[in-house]
Every structure is written in C-alpha cells, then in structure tokens.
Amino acid sequence: MKFYKLTPDYDRIKHELARIGVDSYALNMVKKGVSLNILVRDIKAPAANILKQESIASGMDAAVKKGVVSCSIDKTDVLLMGNTATFERLIKRLSMQVFGLKELGKELSLFLKSKEFKNITYNKGVIDVSKPLCMGILNTTPDSFSDGSLYVTEEAIAARIDEMVELGIDIVDIGGMSSRPFSESISSDEEIKRIKFALDYIKQYDMIVSVDTNNYKTAEYALNNGADIINDISGMTDDNMVFLCGQSKCAVCIMHMQGSPKNMQNNANTEYNNIIYDIHDFFTKSIDKCLNAGIGYSSLILDVGFGFGKTVEQNYILLKYLNEFKSFNLPLLAGISRKSMIGAVIDKDVNNRLAGTVCANTAAILNGADIIRVHDIKEGIDTVKIADYILKAYI
C-alpha cells in the first residue's frame, strides 16, 4: 500500500478520478477535492451565528470573532472554509434564512457560477488572454527610472517598435510621462508631443497599442490616433477619463496607486488597513464607476500597481497572493520589470535586474497574471512561454 499527496487543483483531481475509473456521475466528486476559502466582511452577530451553524451542517466550517456566540459584539468578519460541493449545500440552506443571508447565498451562487473572461473585448475587436501576454514598454521620456532618454528621437523610437514587432510582442505600451517615484507631472501638450511619432509610426503594423497616461486630454489624442487600451495609473479616478473611455469603448487598465508619483512613496501613502482588502475595495469602486460610464466589464484589466504606494514587503505580499484578485474574473496585468522591489532583494542596480525580473514575472503568471509588462522583450516573451507551459502541463 502506497499513498501520495495530490495538489488540490481541479484538473489534477479530475485526472485522478478518471484514471481510477470512477463512474461518470462520480466525476462530480472533483468538487470535493478543491478547497475554497471565502471571507465575508461585516456581518451582524445574529446572522454570523446562523451562518456558522449552516456551514457546519453543510459539511464545512466558518470562523467568527470571539464574542459572536453571546452576541457581545455587533459585527464580525466570517471566514468560510470548504469546497465547491459544500458551498453548494450551504447556498441551498441559506435560501431559507433571514438577516440578509438569503441574499448572501445568491451572491455566493453567482460567484461560484462566474467564469473568468478569456477575452478582452473593445470597440476594435477582441484580445485573446487564454494564454499569458507580453506587453513591451516604450517610454518616450527623458527621465523614466530605467530607460529614460533611450527612446526620445524618431530613429530610436522607430527602431524600438520594429524590434518589438519582429520579436513577437503582444502589446506595445507607449508612455510619454515618467511615473517613477517623486517625479513631477507634465502638461498634456508635452506628453502628446512625446508620444505622437510613436503612435504615427506603429500604425503600419497590426499591433495592439496601449497608452500609459492618466491625463484625459492625452488619452483622447491617443484614442483618436490608434490606441486600443488606456493604461491609467490613477485607476480611473478622473471623471473626465472615465467618460472619455466610456464614449470610445476602448479597453481600460485600472491600476491601484495611493497618492501621485510625486508623493506615493511617502509614509502616509504606504499605509493600509489590509493591503489586499483595501486594493480589492478600490477596484470594486473603480469598476462600478467604469460600468456606470458605459465601459464594458469585459473591456477591463486590473493592475495592483507594484511599486506605486507600496513598500518592498507589501509588493511581495501582493505578488504572493495575486491570485486573490482573480475573484473579479478579469485579466490581471503585472508591472514588475526592473523595479526597486527587485533591486532591494538582490542588491542590484536598475541595469542588472534581468534575472530578478524574470523570476518575479514567472511567479506573477503562476499566481494569476495574464499580462506582464516588460523592458526586456526577448526575455519577457520567453518568460511567458515557459510560465504558460507550466500552467498547461497536465499528467
């Protein structure tokens, strides 16, 4: 007799059930083999008591704050721990409950049934994200933290675009304003001046073009000149930007940042109650704002904003638990390339962070990133290929 520990992965468990030779109906047991943990916040104590009992009756468990049983506290968060099968039983039991638990059951049901978007849809078509994509950085700026002044002449910009297209990049991200820590903002006129040639030159190629800007005037120019995606580091907090993108039906990347590039690394802007939940709440508000402006849900991309108002430790917490943001069922973009979070760990300057970048980007993809944003194109494309091969490797 031998025993083996199996990874609680849907495809892994399903494979073993089929290999064992179970009856076809018994393949549904795969639901029992994949653990599922869901945190429900701010539930009143009476409802939490019922939720805990119904969870236990469903074959799972619920952790609540001390004092809930006696109702000596008003509210608690509840950690529900089970698997797909037990959650389905819980949902049925909640359908007969009060104190808002019936509505909670409906929300849990929608969550279990929801499917991740494998396509980004927008006014010009569809971007397939069924496999990870590589976004190449083109900073037409004199002061970016890594490649400032490298691509400021028309010859250099053209050569960079030609190189990225030849190597097979999936998306080109053009930026005309540096967002490095402590950088100053510039006028939209100057930003447009910097990106104009790149937008004109890239039109000869059948290429998905993203423009990295938080200025709606720059975004308007970019969209009128071929841009497909607006990559907004301010997370669609500007009503003018939201309205513009809603009218154009472009794809939108919502990035999280506290403060502005000039002050985002100040102590006040790296403080969180809980960094994962705080960013989750930020995304929820930004997504609602976008939907209300007419931006399609499947047109959205999320970026937790590595290095934007985060300490080194916070960046790695986000990298480790990036998959938790897949609860939105939207593509995730990871912008880690050459950043100080890498240099701080390996003690290398910005020009010697390639190996660290490859490692971090691989981790990001394995933890849920659908798009990685890179300076080093060849290595970025190779990273995507290897990580995708790992993800699709089955027994």
Feature names for model-found ranges:
Residues A159-G175, N367:
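Catalytic domains of carbohydrate-active enzymes, especially glycoside hydrolases
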Residues L39, I43, Q53-Y151, E155-I161:
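N-terminal capping/lid subdomain adjacent to the active-site entrance of alpha/beta enzymes
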Residues M1-K31, I50, K75, E88, ...:
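N-terminal amphipathic alpha-helix/helix-capping segment at the start of soluble metabolic enzymes
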Residues M29-I43:
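Short glycine-/aliphatic-rich beta-strand segments at the starts of folded cytosolic domains
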Residues F3-Y10, P46, I50-Q53, A57, ...:
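Active-site-adjacent loop and "lid" segments of alpha/beta metabolic enzymes
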Residues N37-V40, A63-V64, L79-G82, S95-E103, ...:
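Conserved beta-strand positions in the central sheet of alpha/beta enzyme cores
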